[in-house]
Amino acid sequence: MAAHKRSTSAVPGTREMSYFEQQRQALIEEIAMNFEHVLANINKLNRSLEAVIAVGNEFSSVEALWSQFENVMAKAPEEEANAKAGEEQEGDGNAGAGDRGANDAGQV
């Protein structure tokens, strides 16, 4: 019987743990293990985010180059539109008469 009593006690020389205390200890151990898993997953997520940020930073020079290209291309249509507007103002009298003559010839 002494052997039976020794096997149920948590540590030799201490009192036996009640069912509640055993269940509480098991739950505490499970919670601690789950916290360790959560911590490991958070660390993995942090490393992944750092890798994504590093890749994004590698493309900053490419992004700057494309932005510069976009700005140049955006200015070109504006300059072209301004040039066309200037040409139309200079040639309004001649262009209108020539267009009407071509249309009249096609309708006859």
UniProtKB/Swiss-Prot annotation:
Location relative to the cell: Chromosome, Centromere, Kinetochore; Cytoplasm, Cytoskeleton, Spindle; Nucleus
Chief site of localization: nucleus
A single GO cellular-component term on record: DASH complex
Parts of the chain that traverse the membrane: none
InterPro entries with a match to the protein in the record: DASH_Dad1
Keywords of the record: Cell cycle, Cell division, Centromere, Chromosome, Cytoplasm, Cytoskeleton, Kinetochore, Microtubule, Mitosis, Nucleus
Covalent S-S links between cysteines: none
GO molecular function terms noted in the UniProt entry: microtubule plus-end binding
KW Cell cycle (keyword) present: yes
GO biological process: attachment of mitotic spindle microtubules to kinetochore; attachment of spindle microtubules to kinetochore; cell division; mitotic sister chromatid biorientation; protein transport along microtubule to mitotic spindle pole body
UniProt keyword annotation of Cell cycle present: yes
Ranges of compositional bias, category Basic and acidic residues: 77-87
Annotated spans, Disordered: 77-108
Family per record: Belongs to the DASH complex DAD1 family.
Name of the protein: DASH complex subunit DAD1
